[in-house]
Curated annotation (Swiss-Prot):
<feature type="domain" description="ACT 1">
    <location>
        <begin position="34"/>
        <end position="110"/>
    </location>
</feature>
<dbReference type="Pfam" id="PF01842">
    <property type="entry name" value="ACT"/>
</dbReference>
<feature type="domain" description="ACT 4">
    <location>
        <begin position="326"/>
        <end position="405"/>
    </location>
</feature>
<keyword id="KW-0677">Repeat</keyword>
<dbReference type="InterPro" id="IPR045865">
    <property type="entry name" value="ACT-like_dom_sf"/>
</dbReference>
<dbReference type="GO" id="GO:0009737">
    <property type="term" value="P:response to abscisic acid"/>
</dbReference>
<dbReference type="Pfam" id="PF24931">
    <property type="entry name" value="ACT_ACR9_3rd"/>
</dbReference>
<dbReference type="GO" id="GO:0016597">
    <property type="term" value="F:amino acid binding"/>
</dbReference>
<dbReference type="InterPro" id="IPR002912">
    <property type="entry name" value="ACT_dom"/>
</dbReference>
<dbReference type="InterPro" id="IPR040217">
    <property type="entry name" value="ACR1-12"/>
</dbReference>
<feature type="domain" description="ACT 2">
    <location>
        <begin position="115"/>
        <end position="196"/>
    </location>
</feature>
<feature type="domain" description="ACT 3">
    <location>
        <begin position="248"/>
        <end position="324"/>
    </location>
</feature>
<protein>
    <recommendedName>
        <fullName>ACT domain-containing protein ACR8</fullName>
    </recommendedName>
</protein>
<comment type="function">
    <text>May bind amino acids.</text>
</comment>
Amino acid sequence: MAMKGYLDEYEKLVIRMNTPRVVIDNGVCSSATIVKVDSSRRNGILLEAVQILTDLNLSIKKAYISSDGTWNMDVFHVTDLNGNKLNDQSVLRYIEQSIETVYYGENIEVNGLTALELTGTDRIGLLSEMFAVLSDLNCDVVDAKLWTHNGRVASVIYLKDCISGAPILDSHRISKIEGRLKNVLNGDNDVNSAAKTCVTVDSMMHIERRLHQLMFEDRDYERRSKKHERSPMVVVTVQNWAERGYSVVNVHCRDRTKLLFDVVCTLTDMEYAVFHATINTAEDQAHLEFYIRHKDGSPISSEAERQRVIQCLEAAVERRALEGVRLELRHPDKQGLLAEVTRTFRENGLNVTRTEISTSSDMATNIFYVTDANGDEPDFKLIESVREKIGLECLRVKEMPTMYHKKGDGEEQQQTKAVLVSLGSLVWRNLFNFGLIKSCS
């Protein structure tokens, strides 16, 4: 009996030691909320923390990540999309509780839905054809996300039966859905399309992480578009620091929401461990620096591997780049709604480059990023014509909130210095000793 009590206390101690400690500070910095995370080191812990922050549509203005090999210390400077500090206590509690529970590594469960994964060759009208097939097969699209990049498309769609509202479990019906969608993705006998479909009713991982994985598996990073060759959206460099046994990765690009998630997600899925990192934003620009190793502790070992890391990180940033006009559709949900809307896009020469579909309480809230056939921003008159056909009150042109930055962050720099001094830990001294932080800005 005494042994059982001892084991219970030991188990509690292990859980307490491995559970991340979160401190949220709204007083030290006037322009951002500081989120500090202390945790024992394990694979994926950084990605999970960043994922929680980005899923709340928070902007990470600055971040400092450091590890002594067994312990992590991460500090994030976050705001909402309008550049305001976080004052909603329910949001602050959610952040704290969510990060503290990632130790248990639970998968995302989608109750009562069937998950559909698709990859193939992108073309104008593809989304319209996909939704037309699903409508014809009495599939109700509840949630979905679709990305396009370098001529490829990846999508994760959650379905239920239109009539019963239940998940689709019948193997014959699932096979029919997969077959018809694969025909759509293949197009006119395109032997190079390499279309893939997969239907599952199991719990799924984070949908945006899965989209990155689908694009990576499809090797979209090898098909750099002429548009990106002319005007690179992101500059990535990789160098080895032989003395310390690190590979140093620098990413410079335009700042946007979820940027840090996209980069850390890709590094994690490529099985690199981030030991130290600094993230800084100024105006609309972002600079990210990572000190990484393989899981076995070795740095990048060849020129081919170095080039692959560069290509994959460029692709990770470009996949979510804001291209085209953002249209938001809010409409009572009904069977065939998505097929009707996307058919109107196709008939008017609009190409959908990215999509986010969600349904709540019988109301559909959908986001479409559209371009013309050449990948350029569509003419305003064309957009208004499409809105009139779908419904001016239902379909609106929506601008993303401007990323909030101050030109002179002198006050914040002083406050950041105070944060670093107050931490006073060996881990933070390592950041300076290793030369990972040249200044506190």
